[in-house]
Each structure stands twice: as C-alpha cells, then as structure tokens.
Design a protein with these regions (language model features):
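Eukaryotic scaffold repeat domains enriched in small/polar residues
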Residues: 1-272
C-alpha cells in the first residue's frame, strides 16, 4: 500500500482494477464509474469508450471495446470478477456509440448517457435492456451531448447537457422537470460542462469545463459557490472533467489539462 500525506490528510493507495482489454475484466479507455446499490455494493459499473474514433468511418464500425462492464473488484490487482458486459457499440436500442456517464438508482437500475445518440439507455442490474429516452435538440428534455449523470435520493435524474451548456433535471422515466445554466461566464452560467456530483446536504457540483472551474448549486439550480480559476497553480484548474464528493464533504476535482486531482473543502477553500 502506498501512502501520501497532504495538507494533514492521509491518502492510501490500495491497488488498481483492470487492465487494457477489449473484453473481460479489462477496460478500453474507461471514462466513468458507478457503484451498485446496498444489495449490490461489491459491484462497480465501468464505461469503456473503446478506441474513441470518429463514428461512421468505415474502418471503425465495430468500435472494439465499447461496452459497460459490471465488475467486482478483488482485494489485490488481478482478482477482479466480471459479472456481465452489456450495451456494446451500435445505434439500435440498448446499444451505444459514445457512452459518457453511468449512474444507478435506488432500485439498482442502471442509466447510461450517450453523447452521440443524445439519449439515455436504461438497464436492470444484470444488464438487461429496459428502455431508452431522449432525443437531439435544444428544447426541454432534449440533449446535445449528454455526459455526466447524477441520481438523487428521490430517484430524480440530473444530466449534464454538455453542448447545450446546461444541466437538466428529469424523472427516472425521462419526464422533464427543470433546467439551469446556459452558455456564458457568469456565476450561474456554464461552458461545456461535464462531470456532476452531490454531497450529503443535496448540493450539486458541476465541472464547468471551458470556464476552468467547478460550480456548486442547490438542488433547484440556484448558485451557491464556485471553486477554482484558470491556471496551473495550487487551487487553479484547467478544463476540469470529473468531480466527486466524499462523506466529509471534501470535493475532488479531476484537473484534466493539469494532469492532477485537486481537493477543495465544501466552501471552495483549496485543501490539496
């Protein structure tokens, strides 16, 4: 085990899960992960985007490795157990082209965003396709590049609508509830947002990719705080992507252009 101490906090690295592979317990360009419900707590769902080539190019139609893997991590590297694989490459219902986000609701139902098909595909916990909803557009309940996805304790769904520069809130059946954001640099506007997470108080954190910050909102979309500013220094961000919140309320941000993870307190103070 590798231990790192930063800002008085201890971070223990245990082991890696997976390897480069187009099937089985390995992954091909993994981009998102979600844990199962309490009844399925040992499992994780991992999205592989495959070779990340441009769709509709004849030599890439198979898009080797695109899929969702349900895996039970072992206690050490190499002991992973593959439960199932599902949602491979394609345009038919139940298939994906550019999967981007994954989330699991309270009943164990799995939701996958597809930023190419502009839809959300829904599966049971074993990967059986149930339905899909969403379509291309700029109106309510329509998408242009859905990416990050979050499900709250009431099973309402928040989807980062990247190229529409907004967050949409919907029911688990896809019925539209609310929208916030819009293209801009103001404190409640977004530019190509990507990741999304929530804390135990219900606040929602969105990585505002091209504004080089993470914004904090109430569950109804009211602005609460902003983390980071453009740059390479401590507490500065370059095109942040993923975001997560731990049980203590600390916010972990994937600082994409700076090739690092930074940690902030819930009020936006830089930690490490």
């Amino acid at each position: 085990m590798q231990t790192q101490i930063a800002a008085g906090r201890v971070f223990d690295f245990s082991h890696a899960v997976g390897r480069s592979a187009a099937s089985g317990t390995g992954f091909r360009h993994p981009c998102a992960v979600a844990t199962g419900t309490e009844a399925d707590a040992d499992a994780v769902y991992v999205i592989s985007r495959g070779f990340e080539m441009i769709p509709n190019v004849h030599w890439n139609r198979t898009a080797l490795g695109v899929r969702v893997s349900k895996v039970i991590p072992g206690l050490v590297s190499g002991e992973e157990e593959l439960v199932t694989e599902f949602s491979t490459y394609g345009e038919d219902p139940g298939k994906v082209i550019w999967p981007a986000g994954v989330a699991v609701d309270s009943q164990g139902t799995v939701y996958i965003t597809d930023e190419w098909m502009n839809r959300i595909s829904v599966f049971d916990s074993e990967g059986k396709f149930l339905k899909c909803w969403g379509e291309s557009g700029t109106g309510d309940g329509k998408f242009d590049g859905p990416s990050g996805i979050l499900i709250d304790p009431q099973d309402d769904i928040y989807i980062v609508d990247t190229r529409n520069h907004r967050v949409q809130k919907l029911t688990k059946d896809g019925a539209y509830l609310a929208t916030w954001g819009g293209l801009g640099r103001a404190k409640d506007q977004l530019d190509s947002p990507w990741g999304i997470a929530s804390d135990s108080d219900g606040y929602i954190y969105v990585s505002d990719h091209m504004n080089h910050r993470v914004q904090k909102f109430t569950p109804t979309g009211e602005f609460a705080a902003s983390f980071g500013s453009p740059g390479t220094g401590r507490g500065e961000l370059g095109r942040p992507s993923g975001v997560a919140v731990d049980p203590e309320g600390d916010v972990y941000i994937c600082d994409w252009s700076n090739n690092r993870v930074q940690v902030f307190a819930a009020d936006g103070r830089f930690v490490t």
